[in-house]
From Swiss-Prot:
HAMAP family: UPF0291 (MF_01103). Its main location: cytoplasm. Keywords: Cytoplasm. It comes from Bacillus cereus (strain ZK / E33L). It comes from the Bacteria. It is found in: Cytoplasm. This is UPF0291 protein BCE33L1708. Pfam families: DUF896 (PF05979). Belongs to the UPF0291 family. One of its GO terms (cellular component) is cytoplasm. InterPro entries: DUF896 (IPR009242). The keyword Cytoplasm applies.
Length: 76
């Protein structure tokens, strides 16, 4: 993940300074898509394993999140 982000930043700096070749532009787009998918997957995983509890110990997790958590458990 760090390598992908490093290369994205490297290409971005080069784009601002001198521009990118067609191959570099394609690489940049592919890396950005890969990074975005990985980031979203990590965030989804975190959210789907989250339970929100108020001060009284009651589960106040939003209904939409609870539904998604149930669907995930059913699909496993």
């Amino acid at each position: 993940m760090k390598n992908i982000l490093f290369r994205i930043n490297e290409l971005s700096k080069k784009e601002k300074a001198t521009g990118l070749t067609v191959d570099e532009k394609q690489e940049q787009q592919m890396l950005r898509q890969n990074y975005t998918q990985t980031f979203r997957g990590s965030l989804d995983s975190i959210l789907l394993n989250t339970k929100i509890v108020d001060q009284n110990g009651l589960n106040v997790t939003p209904a939409a999140l609870q539904d998604a958590q149930i669907r995930l458990k059913l699909s496993k």
